[in-house]
Design a protein with these regions (language model features):
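C-terminal edge strands of extracellular/lumenal beta-sandwich accessory domains
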Residues: 116-131, 173-247
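Hydrolase catalytic cores
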Residues: 1-32
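Extended, solvent-exposed segments with strong compositional bias
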Residues: 134-179
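Flexible domain-boundary/linker segments
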Residues: 23, 35-39, 117
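Secreted peptidase-domain scaffold signal
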Residues: 41-129
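Activation corresponds to long, low-complexity, non-globular regions
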Residues: 29-47, 231-238, 242-247
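Intrinsically disordered low-complexity regions specifically enriched for long asparagine
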Residues: 107, 162-165, 208
Length: 247
């Protein structure tokens, strides 16, 4: 299976990373466009990419960041001044193609019927920008911020991926967006009477230069080093690297 090849290709042997990579690679079998909300009802997140090289590696015009960690329930994780590629800032606006996949295994309890998933993890990648009053505020871009009212909980579940243990988002910024800097925000909530302390999760973010010209990978790696982030390359089996001629 494709999943087996991905899992066996990783030195870590972490099933959740392999699963997340598989979903992250999914493509629309109906066209080369992103999967719409309506299509998703019939084809889910699409078909996994059978090309192992494209699943495990990326070109210089793109960078993929994998966060495999855990979050304390009732709190949030935030990376301010997120290292968004500077070459994608042109004429005062941010551009780029963004794919984001979030996967976690929530505690399940059949005693609660349709509410059997007991935790929900949300993620937002967005920008800090000035509002009309000249105040700085955060605006989610992937996914786009939506002001859900409590009475529309069903709508949020159906269209906002709430309580879904796999969330997949895509956006191609064509017109550009204004913003001072980027921020990654993750939070975790539970249903009532769910006594859970921590929720492990895997988050994958890919940022591409749509033109394929800019060296996005090296630029983001440089930002990570400058800001003191601790990170490692994805550990791929040596035989896989040799197979595709990747050092």
């Amino acid at each position: 299976s494709i999943y087996g090849h991905v899992l066996n290709g990783l030195n870590t042997g972490k099933a959740n990373i392999a699963k997340a990579l598989l979903f992250h690679s999914c493509q629309n079998p109906l066209s080369d466009k992103a999967i719409s909300k309506d299509d998703a009802q019939y084809i889910g997140f699409g078909l996994p990419n059978p090309n192992l090289r494209e699943v495990l590696f990326c070109d210089r015009s793109a960078v993929t960041l994998i966060f495999d960690t855990e979050i304390q329930v009732g709190t949030y994780l935030s990376i301010d001044n997120f290292p968004y590629p500077k070459p994608l800032f042109k004429n005062g606006k941010w551009h780029g193609e963004i794919m984001m996949t979030l996967l976690y295994n929530p505690p399940l309890d059949a005693n609660f019927g349709q509410e059997y998933c007991r935790t929900n993890v949300d993620v937002s990648l967005g920008v800090y920008k000035y509002n009309a009053k000249g105040e700085i505020e955060f605006k989610g871009q992937v996914p786009l911020d939506v002001k859900w009212e409590e009475k529309y909980e069903r709508e949020r579940v159906e269209n906002g991926f709430k309580w879904c243990p796999i969330k997949s988002y895509y956006r191609k910024i064509k017109q550009g967006i204004e913003g001072v800097s980027w921020r990654l925000y993750i939070d975790c909530t539970t249903r009532s009477n769910a006594f859970i302390q921590r929720q492990p999760f895997t988050l994958i973010i890919t940022i591409k230069d749509p033109s394929g010209k800019e060296d996005i990978y090296s630029e983001v790696i440089s930002q990570l080093r400058e800001r003191g982030f601790t990170f490692n390359d994805l550990q791929v089996q040596e035989r896989i690297r040799n197979l595709y001629g990747i050092a």
